[in-house]
Amino acid sequence: MLTEIWADLMQTFVLAAVIVAVEAYFCGCFNGAVIVSKYILRDDVRNHGSGNAGLTNFYRTFGGPLTAVVILTDVLKAVVAIWIGIFVIESFFTNEPTLTITAVKYWAGLFCLLGHMFPCMFHFKGGKGILSGGTIAIMIDWRIALVVWGGFLILTVLTRYVSLGSLWAGASFPFISWYCYPDPVIVVLAFACGGLVVWQHRANIKRLLSGTENKFSFHRKK
């Protein structure tokens, strides 16, 4: 009897985890830069600049008030992905401890990032996950958000290299997560999230080392 109960519990847990992963991934697929540029401006942002479907490349290429739409889209999809994830878990399991809800946020956040970076509806060519990732950090814990966003803003302002601030965000995320939540599952998920962000910036790392990386400017290139 006990074995059957545990088996049913594991099946329910796996089902809930899969549902959260799928919904978070498809939320992440709604890439603001691609949607606005391709369907509103009729000029895919991935055909310009760095070829990245992210906020920085969109601003450098198009600028204008539609940048706010890109920001709003990438922020809201991360919020929705995590909210739905929490709702799913609470629907399957009642009175879940805080640590479990936190782990769900990381799980949903990871798949939201995967959807943003590799969107199936846009030929798996998406962004680098900084804005969505930063939103996920805020949703998880203000202490994590403070370290991630604080370092990002300081480095970006001082050096004008958005990529350098982004690398800080990706690299610091797992370590501050480890400090705040020394749980093996959470640490693994945090390293997966941070590792994805750093990996997506591998070309930027090469340009930073060679001194050819573009600096951010509020005046977009014509």
Regions from the PLM with identified roles:
Residues 15-40:
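N-terminal signal-anchor transmembrane alpha helix
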Residues 16-20, 66-70, 76-121, 140-147, ...:
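Nucleotide and nucleotide-moiety/phosphate-recognizing core
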Residues 34-67, 126, 206-222:
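Cytosolic, membrane-interface loops and tails of multi-pass inner-membrane proteins
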Residues 43-55, 121-134, 161-169:
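Short, non-helical or kinked segments that cap or interrupt transmembrane helices
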Residues 146, 162-169, 181-193:
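Loop-to-transmembrane alpha-helix initiation sites
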